[in-house]
Amino acid sequence: MLQYARELIATIMQKDPAAHSRWEVVLAYPGFHAVMIHRLSHWCWTQDWKTVARVVSHAGRFLTGIEIHPGARIGRRVFIDHGMGVVIGETAEVGDDCTLYHGVTLGGTSLAEGTKRHPTLEPNVIVGAGAKVLGAFTVGEGARIGSNAVVIKPVAAGATIVGVPGRQ
């Protein structure tokens, strides 16, 4: 857990010019807190401690304004900047080195239990403020989703998607 924290602190220091010190990140960055709390809640989820996982996740949402379902899989060095209102669903997967801005939703379009309902972000994806990525499909490595875009179809690696509905 400590290694994940160190990596995430270094990532935030690199990606956010407003971060002035490591202590500032540890004490005052809700995206850092949300990801670290998620690591604990996800571990509880994988141990089949579902209720404990949900309580830990709920505490994280209360403290940060960022809702990450304990079943979601979050990669290393995922940076949630200005995270208020971010929602990441149960079957979502966020690859290493992705960046999510405030108001992003990685949501589902189905209520079917036991199936993949949420998107998969491959490594190095950036999702702009207010964007909604909805459904069980993949956003390819290095893709960029513009602010307030609504994406409901797969996105090719390296593509830039904007608008409602999202298009290249």
Regions found by a protein language model. Give the residues of each.
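Glycine-rich phosphate/ribose-binding loops and adjacent secondary-structure elements
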Residues: 113
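Terminal amphipathic alpha-helical/low-complexity segments used for targeting or macromolecular assembly
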Residues: 1-64
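Left-handed beta-helix
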Residues: 64, 69-70, 75-76, 81-90, ...
